[in-house]
């Protein structure tokens, strides 16, 4: 298995798809990396030689990926929460941020329903 940016890239996949195993690299960025490195994106990962892998590592290294990207995202959310702005408050409460309705729906963000409280005594 090829190892790029601390991630094992699956051998059986094409280079373009295999690079998407790296957090922060999608299909578009993967294609751009392959073009910049001069590697055919239809080539399987197991068929890449050491020179190709080194070029890919160099190109991926130009972007913020994996742990650094996760840390940056977490810090941005923490900053919003510390500011106390609307988006930060919504993050803190675990509610949708972008104006979606919450009276019904929003189950993904709010989590599973709580058991209904019975009003009878």
UniProtKB/Swiss-Prot annotation:
InterPro entries: Rbsml_uS13_C, Ribosomal_uS13, Ribosomal_uS13-like_H2TH, Ribosomal_uS13_bac-type, Ribosomal_uS13_CS. It comes from the Bacteria. Keywords: Ribonucleoprotein, Ribosomal protein, RNA-binding, rRNA-binding, tRNA-binding. It comes from Paraburkholderia phytofirmans (strain DSM 17436 / LMG 22146 / PsJN) (Burkholderia phytofirmans). Residues 94-121 are annotated as: Disordered. The keyword Mitochondrion does not apply. One of its GO terms (biological process) is translation. HAMAP family: Ribosomal_uS13. Gene3D superfamilies: 1.10.8.50, 30s ribosomal protein s13, domain 2. Part of the 30S ribosomal subunit. Forms a loose heterodimer with protein S19. Forms two bridges to the 50S subunit in the 70S ribosome. The lineage of its organism: Bacteria, Pseudomonadati, Pseudomonadota, Betaproteobacteria, Burkholderiales. GO terms for molecular function: rRNA binding; structural constituent of ribosome; tRNA binding. This is Small ribosomal subunit protein uS13. Belongs to the universal ribosomal protein uS13 family. NCBIfam families: uS13_bact. Located at the top of the head of the 30S subunit, it contacts several helices of the 16S rRNA. In the 70S ribosome it contacts the 23S rRNA (bridge B1a) and protein L5 of the 50S subunit (bridge B1b), connecting the 2 subunits; these bridges are implicated in subunit movement. Contacts the tRNAs in the A and P-sites. PANTHER family: 30S RIBOSOMAL PROTEIN S13/40S RIBOSOMAL PROTEIN S18, SMALL RIBOSOMAL SUBUNIT PROTEIN US13M.
């Amino acid at each position: 298995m090829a190892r790029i940016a601390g991630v094992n890239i699956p051998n059986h996949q094409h280079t373009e798809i295999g690079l998407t195993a790296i957090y922060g690299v999608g299909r578009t960025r993967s294609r751009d990396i392959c073009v910049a490195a001069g590697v055919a994106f239809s080539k399987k990962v197991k068929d890449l030689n050491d020179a190709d892998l080194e070029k890919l590592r160099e190109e991926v290294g130009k972007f913020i990926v994996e742990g650094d990207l996760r840390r940056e995202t977490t810090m941005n959310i923490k900053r919003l929460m510390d500011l106390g702005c609307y988006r930060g408050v919504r993050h803190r409460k675990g509610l949708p941020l972008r104006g979606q309705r919450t009276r019904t729906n929003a189950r993904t963000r709010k989590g599973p329903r709580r058991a209904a409280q019975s009003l009878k005594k």
